[in-house]
């Protein structure tokens, strides 16, 4: 995030109303590819007002977490845990070592007119759906899940409208578009 003032540009975009879904492996290395000596994240901790506590390799066998509505959420591959404004906590650790119980694993923080949704683990399935639905709702985007690992969002700009499809699990997938959607052109490949 240090190159070409990207961090500053993202922060300005969020303050102006953007919704940034970030983590868990974002902003952990400097522009030389080295870890920061004095903090885990480069600018995220100061920007959203949190203190990173732990980074733990975890596959959900030793640590359990729950969303604020008490439904279970998965802990997949890695767990970054932090403390900060508890109003921003979306999900927290509920079982594991006493030092980590109650720590935030997913959080959402209001910055200016926008929001930062910080992921402490790699969301899958229903957890990814929940995060995408939340982010799209705050961004004013209609969200639809096309398949288990594909999201679909309709977008309308000044000169054109379209659909953004994103595969987020590295598995490939298919999305069948309705005939009502009309003729479409892939803007990347033509």
Q: Which residue ranges define each predicted feature?
A:
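A conserved amphipathic helix/loop scaffold
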Residues: 2-190
């Amino acid at each position: 995030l240090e190159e070409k003032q990207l961090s500053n540009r993202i922060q300005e975009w969020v303050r102006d109303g953007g919704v940034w879904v970030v983590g868990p492996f974002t902003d952990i290395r400097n522009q030389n590819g080295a870890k920061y000596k004095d903090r885990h994240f480069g600018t995220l901790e100061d920007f959203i007002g949190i203190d990173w506590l732990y980074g733990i390799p975890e596959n959900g066998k030793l640590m359990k977490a729950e969303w604020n509505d008490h439904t279970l959420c998965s802990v997949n591959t890695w767990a970054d845990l932090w403390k900060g404004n508890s109003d921003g906590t979306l999900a927290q650790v509920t079982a594991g070592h006493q030092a980590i119980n109650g720590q935030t694993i997913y959080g959402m923080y209001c910055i200016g007119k926008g929001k930062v949704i910080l992921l402490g683990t790699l969301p899958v399935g229903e957890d990814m759906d929940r995060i995408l639905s939340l982010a799209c709702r705050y961004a004013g985007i209609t969200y639809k899940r096309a398949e288990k690992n594909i999201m679909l969002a309709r977008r309308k700009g000044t000169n054109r409208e379209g659909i953004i499809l994103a595969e987020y699990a590295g598995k490939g997938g298919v999305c069948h578009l309705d005939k009502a959607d009309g003729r479409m052109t892939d803007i990347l490949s033509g």
